[in-house]
Every structure is written in C-alpha cells, then in structure tokens.
C-alpha cells in the first residue's frame, strides 16, 4: 500500500490469514482516519477454465474446489472488530480477488462476454456484499452490459483456450462517512506502453487496474 497521506498504523494477521497476501494500514486523511486493506486471493481454480456450459450448481461446485471462499471468510472474520467501527472509521479494501462478481454475471450479460449463458452468484463477491461492503466500480457503473470493467485478460496470457475478458480486481468500501464519487477500470498488456494522464509508462502487470475516487464527510 502506497499512500500520500501519513500511515499511522499497520495491520497484519500472520497467525490467522494464510492467503497470498492480506494486510492493511490506517491513514490520516487531513485529520480523518481511514483504514485501507489489500488482498490477493488464490488464483486457482483458474477463472479462464470456468465451466460455463454447466449448470449454476456445477459451476459453484467447481469454484468451491479452491480456497477463495474460505480465504475471504477468514479475512472477514478477523476484520469484524474493525467492521464494527466502519461508520466512524471507514474501510477501503482492494486487490486481486481472482474471481468474478455476481454483479457482472447477470441475466443481462449471460450471452455476452463469453459468459456462455451462465448466471452465477460468485461466492466471494456475495460474501463481501453480505459483510456490508460496496463494490465501488459497479456502484458508479451499475450497468454491466454497458461497462463490464475489464481488468483481465490481457495479451500476456498464453493459455490456449478461448478467454473471457472480465473483472476480477476490485475496490470495496464501507462506512457512513465515505462515498465513492467516481470509478474506472483500465486494462493493458504486460510490458506495453500505457498512457495515463498524458504520460507514457512501462506497464508492469498482467492485470488491469481499478481507480476509484472517494469523498469523506
């Protein structure tokens, strides 16, 4: 986590969280505390291989063969004391969740974006929603038909199968004193030039990214 605001506290859960990455900080935004967390859930099972020709139950059974659902519930469990304070100290949680969102795999998109006719309640995004988190991008861009918000796949992927372009990177938030006011997704290919705000950069990732702007009361 990089911050232009002072980091006044760090949060680590090495004894209870075994994901690829999870941790956070508290930052001081002009006198207002905000907790910011970053996570990276397991990449298996590979979303590129989701069996969209199967039933909803079979797709969910395939997803549950991995550990992402267990990981997100452990994360939400250790966050409970902080979530209880979210109305006074807002929380932002972003990262590579390595799984789709139920907000994107809807009746309206079932025959778009190579979804193969599937409508899926992906459990990780459901868990985040049930824990009180808002998906900042989908809140600001509520129509997945008009704006899917692709963050993956890019040309860097070499798996020899027909690939969907989808959204598996998210910025969630919650709290009464914070509100998303803008959010965009950007996609680019690893190693290619990326132009952002008039400047050219070497792009260092095989994922795109999400840029969300928040307002604090």
Would you name each region that the model predicts?
Residues 1-49, 185:
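Structured beta-strand-rich core segments of catalytic domains in phosphoester-bond hydrolases
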Residues 17, 63-67, 71, 116, ...:
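Extracytoplasmic/periplasmic, Sec-exported soluble proteins
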Residues 37-38, 92-95:
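Short beta-strand segments
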Residues 46-66, 108-109:
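A solvent-exposed, charged loop/short amphipathic helix patch at secondary-structure junctions
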Residues 59-87:
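A long, amphipathic alpha-helix that forms part
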């Amino acid at each position: 986590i990089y911050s232009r605001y002072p980091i006044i506290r760090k949060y680590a859960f090495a004894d209870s969280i075994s994901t690829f990455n999870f941790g956070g900080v508290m930052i001081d935004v002009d006198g207002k505390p905000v907790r910011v967390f970053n996570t990276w859930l397991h990449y298996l099972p590979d979303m590129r291989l989701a069996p969209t020709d199967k039933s909803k139950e079979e797709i969910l059974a395939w997803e549950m063969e991995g550990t992402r659902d267990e990981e997100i519930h452990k994360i939400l469990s250790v966050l409970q004391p902080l979530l209880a304070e979210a109305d006074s100290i807002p929380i932002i949680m972003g990262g590579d969740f390595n799984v789709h969102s139920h907000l994107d795999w809807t009746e309206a998109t079932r025959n778009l974006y190579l979804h193969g006719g599937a409508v899926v309640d992906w459990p990780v995004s459901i868990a985040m929603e049930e824990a009180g988190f808002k998906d900042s991008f989908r809140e600001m861009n509520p129509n997945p038909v008009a704006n899917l918000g692709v963050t993956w796949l890019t040309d860097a992927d070499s798996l020899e199968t027909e690939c969907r372009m989808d959204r598996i990177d998210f910025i969630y938030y919650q709290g009464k004193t914070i509100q998303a006011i803008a959010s965009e997704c950007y996609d680019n290919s690893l190693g290619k030039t990326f132009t952002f705000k008039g400047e050219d950069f070497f792009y260092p990732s095989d994922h795109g990214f999400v840029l969300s702007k928040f307002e604090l009361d």
